[in-house]
Every structure is written in C-alpha cells, then in structure tokens.
C-alpha cells in the first residue's frame, strides 16, 4: 500500500470530499489540541472544531479510495450525511487495516471507526457499536478450475488442509480459526482485490470474503469464479461503525440520526447505491443480540 499524504480532495459522483491521511500521521494537528480540552463531551468538541477524524479500511464497497484518492463507500457516505446533520461538515479520513481500526481509535488516532466492522462479543467488550449498516455473510471463493468439490463449510477448508485467504485482522480470520483452519494455513490481505490476485497466482487455494466485495470485483474484472453462498457454518453477521465507550454523547447522536435515516428510507437508498440488498428488519437487529456472537 502506497503511503498517503494529507491533501484536500474534490468531491465527485459517488465519492466524498475528505482529507485522507496515512495511519498515525494525524495526531499533532491543532484539531487534536481542541479535542483534548477538558470539560466537554466529544460531540461538543467536534462541533466546535467543525471536523471529525474517521478511521476506515480500503475495502470497497464498504469503504475505500477511488483512483484519484477521494474516499468512497457505504459507511463513509452514511457518516458524511450524519455529520452534516450534527453540524460537523469537515471529515478527515485516515486509512487503516481492519486489525488497526479499534486499536487506532482507542489510541486517539481517530475519533470513531466509519466502516462495516463486524459486531462480535470480543469487540463489544472494547467498543460501543452503532446499529448495523450491513447484514451479510461470507463467500468461499475459488477459481473455476480448482480441483475437487467446492467446500460448503469453513470446516471443510480445515479438513482439506487448504491455504485460505481472508481480510487482515477481520472477523473472518477468527471464524476460520474457530472452524479448525490452522493459523499457518491462513493468508491475510489488506483488501479483496489483493486476495483475488493471490487466488489467481495460486498462492491460496480458496478465499473467504463478503458477497458485496466479490460483486464489486466481478464488475471490474473478468474472472471465472466458483462461489459458495451462504456458507453453512458461517451465518450472516451484522456490521457497524464503532465508538469509544467513553464517548456516549457522540454515539447517541450518531445512532439517533441514523435511525431517522433508516425510518425515512434514506439509509436503504445509500446502501443500494453501493450494491447492498438489505431490509429494515435486518438493520433493526438489536446490537445486544449481535454482541452475543463469539466470532
């Protein structure tokens, strides 16, 4: 991944005008000094600064970068709409891998995570999740000419001794481990295109990734893939933005505005524009229920 420098970018169709920064380089700004003033909740500080820092991964169509460096994706688009309603027009996007999102937020490298971060029991002990913005399972993906039958379960990947790709630091790695796939048989990638490249180069036998990610790749590239969906031992999960436990004011304001968008149909419309097919019933799944899931 090339190092990104801070810069102003112009909005265009399907993207957002966000400042994009490399991981860890956003901590010494005047804005950071505003955010450390005591006696205010984070929401009030952000409203005074007119700016928020979000951590996000380059994982289209959930969130990512266009070729010109502008930020795009379902989660940042939802965040942009909500922040404008809260009087915070400026958004600084800071690129990170999935595995860096929570540690970076807890270290104050960004104010919250604007991504489709899978809601799990372990993560719920560290952060406060917003309502789900995505409710999706995973695909098992292989090249069409792969030998043998197509696995229907993650446990079959373990029994076959296959080398399997998955998003770096994501819930998929834990799901593979729980299914019995040894860690030395798992290859982690920063994004879905890199995982597909490894599949094409025969560095992995199978990949595990989201249906939305696969659809995005198929739109952009001519690849003959065989896909298992749904995966029998990997049911759909809810994914959401994440907030620090000590920032209830920002969390409550964000979730309140998102629920208004959900009720009006605006949330579903944004998700459809990025290729997601979901229902209000799925997006209304209680976070407490999703937090009970182990992986």
Predicted regions and their residues:
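N-terminal secretory signal peptides and thylakoid transit peptides that target proteins
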Residues: 1-20
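Extracytoplasmic small-molecule ligand-binding "clamshell" domains
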Residues: 34-116, 125
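Ligand-binding clefts/hinges and TM-proximal coupling segments of bilobed small-molecule sensing domains
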Residues: 34-35, 171-184, 258-295
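Ligand-binding cleft/hinge of the Venus flytrap
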Residues: 65-67, 79-89, 154, 170-188, ...
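Short helix-initiation/N-cap motifs at beta->coil->alpha
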Residues: 92-103, 152, 187-197, 235
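A ligand-binding cleft/hinge motif common to bilobed small-molecule-binding domains
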Residues: 100, 116-125, 177, 205-235
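Periplasmic-binding protein-like
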Residues: 135-139, 219-255, 277-295
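Flexible hinge/capping segments at coil-to-helix
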Residues: 143-163
């Amino acid at each position: 991944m090339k190092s990104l420098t801070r810069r102003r970018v112009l909005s265009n169709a399907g993207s957002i005008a966000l400042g994009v920064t490399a991981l860890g380089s956003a901590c010494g700004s005047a804005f950071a000094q505003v955010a450390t003033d005591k006696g205010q909740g984070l929401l009030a500080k952000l409203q005074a600064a007119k700016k928020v820092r979000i951590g996000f991964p380059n994982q289209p169509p959930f969130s990512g970068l266009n070729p010109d460096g502008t930020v795009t994706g379902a989660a940042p688009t939802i965040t942009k709409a909500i922040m404008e309603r809260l009087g915070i027009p400026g958004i600084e996007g800071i690129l990170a891998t999935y595995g860096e999102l929570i540690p970076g937020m807890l270290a104050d490298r960004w104010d919250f995570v604007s991504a489709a971060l899978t809601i799990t029991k372990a993560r719920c002990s560290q952060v406060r999740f917003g309502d789900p913005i995505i409710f999706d399972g995973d695909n098992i993906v292989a090249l069409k000419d792969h030998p043998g039958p197509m696995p229907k379960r993650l446990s079959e990947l373990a029994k076959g001794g296959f080398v399997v790709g998955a998003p770096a630091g994501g819930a998929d790695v834990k799901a593979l481990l729980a299914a019995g796939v040894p860690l030395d048989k798992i290859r982690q990638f920063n994004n879905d295109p890199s995982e597909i490249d490894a599949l094409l180069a025969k560095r992995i036998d199978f990949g595990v990734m989201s249906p939305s990610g696969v659809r995005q790749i198929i739109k952009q590239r001519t690849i003959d893939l065989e896909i298992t969906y749904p995966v029998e031992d990997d049911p759909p999960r809810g994914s959401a933005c994440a907030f620090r436990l000590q920032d209830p004011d920002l969390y409550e304001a964000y979730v309140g505005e998102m629920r208004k968008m959900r009720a009006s149909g605006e949330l579903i419309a944004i998700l459809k524009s990025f290729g997601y097919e979901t229902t209000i019933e799925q997006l209304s799944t209680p976070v407490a229920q999703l937090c009970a899931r182990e992986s």
